[in-house]
Design a protein with these regions (language model features):
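Charged, low-complexity intrinsically disordered regions
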Residues: 3-27, 31-197
Length: 197
């Protein structure tokens, strides 16, 4: 897999760092990891989405879930996209998914546990959306963005205001899944109101 990633990086002008990186401090800026210690990341692919003026990283991570006696260790591939301009902070989860696998992601506040869109009931039934500033989130989530999200398989997307963290899968991504992860994030940004200057 590392050899395939290296070839993919060489062919596309990306960088690839296979070694274990214990410095995961930036990932801790996301609420998902408030209660889930990250042990390490590895197999980091990094590149530039020129069309959206954003830098991305796809890496394998290992994180812990649960109390000491019932500690579970998870390995998955996560994507982080640094945005060209600030956006509202929010979390989108597929309804019921994290209930089955592990504790619900800490929502921003009890009052905004689930932001509903009456006009887009199917979206609100499929995804749990939460965040600090409901008004800013409602104006940011345009009809186009909501329709795009409805049409895609999403597990977890989180904005920390300057970057997105995307769990497309809940497993270590295969080499052939990387292009679809990048296509999804690029199309996601195209459906967001970003200042790309």
């Amino acid at each position: 897999r590392q050899n395939r990633f290296q070839k993919m990086a060489n062919a596309n002008g990306w960088s690839f760092e296979p070694d274990v990186d214990w410095n995961t401090s930036y990932l801790r800026n996301f609420r998902f990891f408030d209660s889930r210690p990250i042990e390490m990341k590895s197999n980091s692919l990094q590149g530039l989405d020129i069309e959206n003026n954003s830098q991305w990283e796809i890496a394998d991570i290992v994180f812990d879930e649960g109390a000491l006696l019932a500690l579970e260790v998870y390995q998955t591939t996560v994507q982080v996209v640094r945005l060209p301009s600030p956006i509202p902070r929010f979390i989108i989860d597929k309804v019921g998914l994290f209930d089955k696998i592990f504790d619900r992601v800490i929502s921003f506040s009890e009052s905004n546990l689930h932001i509903h869109f009456k006009k887009h009931a199917a979206f609100s039934d499929k995804f749990q959306l939460s965040g600090d500033d409901e008004d800013a989130i409602r104006s940011f989530f345009t009809d186009d963005l909501i329709r795009f999200l409805e049409q895609n398989e999403i597990h977890h997307i989180e904005s920390n205001g300057e970057a997105l963290m995307i769990f497309t899968y809940l497993h270590i991504a295969r080499t052939d899944e990387v292009p679809s992860m990048l296509e999804f994030s690029s199309n996601l940004l195209k459906n967001m109101d970003l200042n790309r200057n």
